UniProtKB/Swiss-Prot annotation:
The keyword Lyase applies. GO terms for molecular function: tryptophan synthase activity. Belongs to the TrpB family. Tetramer of two alpha and two beta chains. SUPFAM superfamilies: Tryptophan synthase beta subunit-like PLP-dependent enzymes. The gene is trpB. Its EC number is 4.2.1.20. This is Tryptophan synthase beta chain. The keyword Amino-acid biosynthesis applies.
Length: 406
């Protein structure tokens, strides 16, 4: 039996980024289903009725548009560039994940699917998928690495509360990559009534394009909002990167504006030069995994190496193919932030702005703390807060040696 990581099918130029990233590297058993998903997405994405249905849910259910908030205290404290925060933490379910899930769930409904499955790391994508499944009357099953179910017990209970069945994945390193493996295997075995709501801009085509399409609402809004506030484009857009959905959504509307610097912030863990890191773009090499060609943390034999981050949402051993291409082309810059720096930023933004941000987002905030003082006061940074940090309070307290009752 062929595994999900064997190259049994290759795409044409469709679904490719840069020189050769992306594509479809999947078993024959999934090719027909992927073709159906691709056709449905291409047929519906510009369909007026589908767009109206999507927009109605984004506005009246997900609470969009999200705020573009001027971080006055941070700006004054850091003494450099003007800082705006794109507040995806204020969306229904508390993160950017809902944008993509609504779009994919509508697609699933149009395909006649009755059951949604998804992987999740920090739990936010799982919560969003369970939420929309409840709204649309669909069955839902979530696959989550055992390490992550232990780290994110509150989100596990939230998913179950919403009616989802959560499967702790005990294979491999028991983290996000293993949850993706398990979900792909489940989809391959039962695609007739099931739709895989992939949470990040990864996987075989059309998933990276589809996730970007649904997440691009972040930058479409921020571009319009900043134009209304400042009548100009930002000088820099900053977002954290695991697989890369929030970052590609934050970058999308600016990619064709070379005056806007794009910065993706990866999880350096204990340090980029250690073996306890998830800084894929800085440390990874080209390979094939999870149905795509991209950059991965892997050994000389092409076996995926374990990765580490304090953040369950950023410890993925690869990155979306468009991010790999943007890095290769020099259009975007990717930097690493350590656990210690992210934890410091968690406290910093809370005390400066009264915002408890997700530890994933705090990797981006930590970079803003470094770069803003080096910029002129008439320059502007937009930093995306991908989610809220309620889920992280207990683990951050533990990291700091503070005993709290979860």
């Amino acid at each position: 039996m062929k595994t999900l990581n064997e190259t049994t099918q290759q795409s044409t130029r469709a679904g490719r980024y840069g020189k050769d990233f992306g594509g479809q590297y999947i078993p024959e058993t999934l090719m027909t289903e992927l073709e159906k998903v691709t056709k449905a997405f291409n047929d519906l994405k510009d369909n007026p009725e589908f767009k109206a249905e999507l927009n109605d849910l984004l506005v009246n259910y997900a609470n969009r548009p999200s705020l573009l908030y001027y971080a006055k205290n941070m700006t004054e404290d850091l003494g450099g560039a003007k800082i705006y925060l794109k507040r995806e933490d204020l969306n229904h379910t508390g993160a950017h994940k809902i944008n993509n899930v609504i779009g994919q769930a509508l697609l699933a409904k149009h395909l006649g699917k009755k059951r949604l499955i998804a992987e999740t790391g920090a739990g936010q994508h799982g919560v969003a998928t369970a939420t929309i499944a409840a709204l649309m009357g669909m069955d839902c099953e979530i696959f989550m690495g055992k390490e992550d179910t232990d780290r994110q017990k509150l989100n596990v209970y939230r998913m179950e509360l919403l009616g989802a069945k959560v499967h702790p994945v005990t294979s491999g390193s028991m983290v996000l990559k293993d949850a993706v493996n398990a979900t792909l295997q489940e989809w391959a075995s039962r695609s007739d009534d099931t739709f895989y709501v992939l949470g990040s801009a990864v996987g075989p085509a059309p998933f990276p394009e589809m996730v970007k399409h649904f997440q691009s609402v972040i930058s479409t809004e921020s571009k319009q909002q900043l134009q209304a506030k400042e009548t100009r484009l930002p000088d820099m857009v900053v977002a954290c990167v695991g697989g890369g959905s929030n970052a590609i959504g934050s970058f999308a509307a600016y990619i064709d504006d070379p005056s806007v610097q794009l910065v993706g912030v990866e999880a350096a863990g204990k340090g980029v030069d250690t073996d306890r890191t998830a800084a894929t773009i800085e440390r990874g090499s080209v390979g094939i995994f999870h149905g795509m060609k991209s950059l991965f943390m892997q050994n000389e034999d092409g076996q995926i190496d374990p990765v580490y981050s304090i953040s369950a949402g950023l410890d993925y051993p690869g990155v979306g193919p468009e991010h790999a291409a943007l890095a290769q082309e020099g259009r975007a810059q990717y930097v690493g932030i350590t656990d210690d720096e992210a934890v410091e930023a968690f406290t910093y933004i809370a005390k400066q702005e009264g915002i408890v941000a997700a530890i994933e987002s705090c990797h981006a905030i930590a970079y803003v703390e470094k770069i803003a003082p080096q910029m002129a006061k008439d320059q502007i940074i937009i930093c995306t807060l991908s989610g809220r940090g309620d889920k992280d309070v207990a683990s951050i307290a533990k990291y700091k040696g503070v005993d709290v009752d979860e």
